[in-house]
């Protein structure tokens, strides 16, 4: 059974929050809806704190750090490979989970953020796959979440 331990931020409507422990700080990436009815796919915000359970998360100076429906929405855990950080992102330009963008985080400090697209994963390996919207990696395990087109014959 899950129990609420703490509310980290108040008066924030956030989607797909992703935590990262990097360079002596905890970083929280989240899609924020600033105005009621606005899309949660368009902008990515970043916050930092000394501890993951802190109630004093500081907004990043560059917020929103991404304003692009093709790469703002988080799509899984940030991972490290060959000494580089990668942030999986959803391409929601056509529909939810149209493709994944693997963003290489080039700069991550309290005052600067930069990333570039390192790869794109489109759901083209099977004609039944409509969308791909999550890529998570933990050790040797990689999980991809897809949506299938399952047509029923009546």
Features from the language model and the residues they span:
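Carbohydrate-active catalytic/glycan-binding domains of CAZyme proteins
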Residues: 1-154
């Amino acid at each position: 059974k899950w129990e609420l331990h703490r509310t980290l931020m108040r008066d924030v409507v956030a989607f797909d929050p992703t935590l990262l422990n990097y360079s002596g700080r905890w970083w929280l990436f989240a899609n924020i809806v600033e105005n009621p009815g606005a899309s949660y796919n368009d902008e990515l915000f970043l916050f930092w704190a000394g501890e993951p359970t802190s109630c004093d998360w500081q907004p990043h100076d560059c917020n929103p750090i991404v304003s692009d429906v093709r790469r703002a929405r988080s799509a899984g855990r940030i991972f490290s490979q060959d000494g580089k950080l990668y942030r999986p992102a959803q391409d929601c330009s056509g529909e939810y989970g149209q493709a994944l963008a693997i963003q290489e985080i080039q700069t991550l400090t309290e005052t600067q953020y930069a990333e570039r697209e390192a790869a794109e994963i489109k759901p083209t390996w099977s004609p039944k796959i409509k969308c791909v919207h999550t890529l998570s990696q933990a050790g040797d395990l990689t999980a991809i979440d897809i949506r299938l087109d399952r047509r029923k014959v009546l």
